[in-house]
Every structure is written in structure tokens, then in C-alpha cells.
């Protein structure tokens, strides 16, 4: 029987060999993946044309340990890397990193100070997955509990459930010693009041009133920077989220995603962040994936699971993310006008420590800024550019 050598270990270990039959099956899978890419449309910065085999980059060797997150976790990755360097567990590392942001009252994307629902209540969601033990935990629509990533980890460790939601999750948290607190900061409360004023006749001087600007100025004490920020998030409600994933020097992988969800949402709305296989997905033999942006679009394609399966087929993290993005675009028949009403981003790592991310549009939530994500490979945290599916500005700017 003919054998084909496909990889040699740097440590001089025996080569992994494939039989002729396995090689044929692998080639067949690659052909199927290429056909799927043409069906889904879109590729690396090409404006949405169907991808070709040449558009997929070879998988580069990464570095381990590694920890990545969305860009709003940049300053927190060091805490996770410290745990990885000391030989700590990958799940402890990612939860430690996002907890820093959950605790930060000046960050309105997650945790304390997150932007509230339409009634002014902050509702949080989170999920965790632990690759080595194949376990998961999540919580959704949680009020008055700040560190929901840690709460999701507690669900995983202390129960035989995967998800607990709403008041049940709050009561579980209290029973486990979590502190209840008012999560609405003065900053977030003022933005919510401004949104109410903009969205309801009953909460503002009047739709044509010349006093509107004075009213908004009074809410923010004349702070022009805060007024401009409030006007932007009122017009384009953000989906504040941090996915974070890590691989250690042994190749073990974990991930978490934590969020305050869509600003001004209907109470009880749940996005992709706490959904295992959508906003968070880990396979310890392959890699990890997460997402930010409009969670409903990710749920419809099971984005995290899709990315993991693309990694399993041998695609790089970036190309795996672009494949998932292609499915989002396919649902709208690549109609840029419809797709232009929202943002979505995918992030991934593989077992070797390679990493990548894709954005639907070239820009982040601000049209002038390129979409990016945070990476820490052992020396210091840095930002890396997301690869856009459409090389254009979008997202209801």
C-alpha cells in the first residue's frame, strides 16, 4: 500500500502517514469545501465575489501560548497571558482577562456599566467552553450580577446543566456567593435617558422643539464628546461583546464570550454570546471561535460551529471566519444594501496557535476606523486587522 508523508515533527517524532484511501478522501473533502465556498460567496477583501482555491492562504504555524479577543479586550489580555505562562488552565486565563473589562465602569460593552435594555435594566449574557474536558456553561438575561463569565464557569463546574437564564441564573449566582448590585452607571444611565428622549415623544421637549439640543446638552452637562458618542449609539445601537480564546503550550484550548447584548433591546432578548456553537465554540482537537456584532445573524448560521468545522478541514483561522461570513451574506443574497444595516465579526484560533478574524465590512463601528482584534503571543498585546468580507465601509454608517 502506498503511503504519503504529510508532516514531520520538529522534535524528530515519526511522520504522520496517510494511506492512499485517506489521501483520496481528504482530497474529496477539499473539493467539496471549494464548491461550498463558491455557493456561499465572498472571500478575502474581494467585494463579495465567489472565492477560488487560490484565495485561501496556507495555514501558518502559530505561537503557543496564545490569547486573543475582540479589540475592546486589548488591555486585559496580559492578565490571561500571565496565567498561561505559569502553566495555568486556559479557561482560567480567558475568564481572568474578560473579568477585567466586566469590572470596568468606563467600558459600556460588558458587565458593570453595560448599556441597558429599553427599560434601563442592564441584562448580561455569557458562555464558556473548556476544551480539555469537553464541558460548557452559559447564562443569559442575567440582571444585577456583574461577572457573568465567571457565573457561566460556575454553571459548568457546579451543575450538570449547560445554560441557566433569567431570574433563575440570578438566584443561582446569589446561592453561589455572587454579589448583587446595580449595574447601571451614571454614564450608561445618561445615554439611556438620551435614547429615551430621542425615541419617545413623552421623554423629550417635542419632535420639532428647538429645545432638543439644549435638552441633550443638559443631560451631559455640555460635554460635546459625550453628546457625540450618545448620538452615535442612539442612532446605531451597539452590540457590546468580548469573545476571548486561548491555547496553552500543550495545545489545550478554552474560550469565553461575555456581553451586555444589544443596547435598548426588548427585555429578555438573547443574542449569540451565550449560545454554544454560535457565539462560543471550542473543539480541543481543532481550535476555538467566537463572534461580536449582530448576534441574530450568527445564530442563524451557527457561526462558531461552522468555523470549527472549516478549521477541521484544514482552513486557516482567517479563511474559516470568511467562510462563516459568506453564509451570513448568502442569507441576504449578497445584497450590500441589506447587509449594510449591521456589523458582524468572527474570531478564531487553531490548536497550533495560528489566529485570524474577519469582519463583514472594512470598518469597525466607527466608519473611520479599521476593524481589528487583540492578540497576545507572549510579549505584549497588540491589535491586528480583521480581514473584510466586503472591502467597503458599511454597517449603517
PLM region descriptions:
Residues 1-18:
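N-terminal secretory signal peptides
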